[in-house]
């Protein structure tokens, strides 16, 4: 009996020229996803990458698998049809903060509510990059952009809170340059039977450079990021001396460990 050939990262690299800006965080996410796809044990012909409109949505062109570059915000609807038509497929939605949370917000929440076995990768750079720098649904209050020259008045969405409110059964957050964590997260998303929602912090070095500087920099990341693991205490910091506990109002607060804490 012949065995399926073992896939490698190169098997998922297409022959298309990758046309993101030099230094864009999308390169790191693409590299991580290609590596993960090769390790999942799924035949290449069963992968489908579906995207909407935006910089991140060029993903299907750069992945050597089946792909569908859809219209603005409609990737969840198309992915739903694909998964229903052939449940054996491994369906991955690639979208951005504008594509999924603005024009595509309605489609996203109903995808999460239905809980089909698909995976969502939301590239969140807090800006509209493809259209040259307008504020997005995740831009912070006061953000000055081409569309908000005096600063944004709108409060940003918290994508994970939105996903949980819509009934998501798997939510996670990672960052473009932390390859080990991102790969582990994508593997866990694939293993989940239901809709997996992964928010990925991604740097747009042209129109919103440094949006996640404290998390991307290896020197400062330990003091600003906490990796959640089942059954393990919420401890972080370069010296593992900071933690999170519930306050009297059951709200999380950061505390310095040691002494009476």
Can you annotate each of these PLM segments?
Residues 66-67, 111, 136-140, 189-190, ...:
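Short, hinge-like loop/turn segments at secondary-structure boundaries
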Residues 53-128:
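Thiamine diphosphate
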Residues 6, 10-71:
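Active-site diphosphate/adenylate-binding microenvironment
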Residues 105-112, 130-143, 162:
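Active-site-proximal loop->helix
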Residues 1-6, 15, 206-261:
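Flexible, low-complexity linker and terminal segments
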Residues 8, 88, 136-188:
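Conserved thiamine diphosphate
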Residues 169-227, 231:
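ATP/pyrophosphate-binding catalytic subdomain of soluble kinases
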């Amino acid at each position: 009996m012949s065995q399926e050939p073992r896939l490698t990262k190169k098997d998922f690299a297409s022959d298309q020229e990758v046309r993101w800006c030099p230094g864009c965080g999308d390169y790191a996410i693409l590299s991580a996803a290609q590596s993960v796809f090769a390790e999942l044990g799924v035949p290449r012909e069963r992968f489908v990458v579906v995207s909407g409109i935006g910089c991140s949505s060029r993903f299907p062109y750069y992945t050597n698998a089946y792909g569908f570059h859809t219209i603005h915000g409609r990737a969840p609807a198309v992915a739903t049809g694909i998964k229903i038509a052939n449940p054996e497929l491994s369906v991955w939605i690639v979208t951005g903060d504008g594509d999924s949370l603005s024009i595509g917000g309605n489609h996203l929440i109903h995808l999460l509510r239905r809980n089909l076995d698909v995976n969502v990768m939301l590239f969140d750079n807090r800006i509209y990059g493809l259209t040259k720098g307008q504020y997005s649904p995740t831009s912070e209050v006061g953000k000055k952009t081409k569309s908000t020259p005096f600063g944004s008045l709108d409060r940003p969405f918290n994508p994970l809170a939105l996903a949980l409110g819509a009934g998501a059964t798997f939510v996670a957050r990672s960052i473009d340059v932390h390859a080990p964590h991102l790969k582990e997260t994508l593997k866990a998303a694939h293993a989940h039977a239901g809709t997996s929602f992964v928010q990925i912090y991604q740097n747009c070095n042209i129109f919103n450079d440094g949006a996640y500087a404290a998390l991307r920099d290896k020197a400062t990341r330990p003091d600003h990021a906490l990796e959640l693991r089942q059954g393990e205490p919420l401890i972080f910091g370069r010296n593992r001396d900071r933690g999170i506990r519930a306050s009297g109002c059951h709200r999380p607060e950061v505390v310095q460990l040691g002494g009476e804490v």
